[in-house]
A protein has these predicted regions:
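Non-catalytic protein-protein interaction segments used by genome-maintenance enzymes to assemble
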Residues: 1-46, 50, 54
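Metal-dependent nuclease catalytic regions and adjoining charged, substrate-binding loops involved
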Residues: 2, 38-41, 50-159
């Protein structure tokens, strides 16, 4: 069994009002009010940013500053929001991560990955939706004809 390595790229880390924060930039076409910022509590990306920053810098991170650019026809608007994680929340997130990793290990051992059909329409829709909607015995053919196999993304490579 190999150890897991969580990795990615932080946009930046800043000092703000005497505290250390991770900063993230987002764009949206909708109005970024309270409802918009609610999507970041809870949120895997923001929780992991908090945890990773604390590991990397060896000191507490107060939270994540989310700078949002609303892009619309004829105007742009910029809004700043904040999200915070308590030590209990980060511990719970890590516990949940261990659970999901064990589950994924079981899928890998079985050689079977069940569909998560509640996520097909998220974030503009899954690229594999057309394949998954086919009968299981023809999916491999659709994969080969509609997709190109590439080298997996490696976040350890410099951008």
């Amino acid at each position: 069994r190999q150890p897991y390595l969580l990795c990615g790229h932080l946009d930046r880390v800043v000092n703000f009002n005497g505290d250390k924060y991770v900063m993230d930039q987002k764009t949206t076409t909708s109005t970024p009010g309270a409802h918009y910022f609610n999507q970041y509590e809870p949120n895997n990306q923001m929780s992991l940013y908090t945890i990773a920053s604390q590991v990397i810098f060896g000191s507490p991170i107060r939270g994540v500053i989310i700078d949002v650019a609303q892009v619309a026809v004829g105007f742009s608007r910029f809004i700043r929001g904040f999200t915070y994680r308590t030590p209990d929340q980060t511990e719970e997130w890590l516990k949940d991560l261990r659970y999901w990793l064990r589950l994924a290990e079981g899928y890998a051992t079985e050689g079977y990955w069940p569909q998560n059909d509640t996520a097909c329409d998220k974030f503009g829709g899954c690229r594999f939706r057309e394949v998954c909607s086919k009968s299981p015995h023809v999916r491999e053919q659709f994969l080969k004809s509609s997709f190109e196999k590439r080298e997996p993304w490696n976040p350890l490579k410099a951008r």
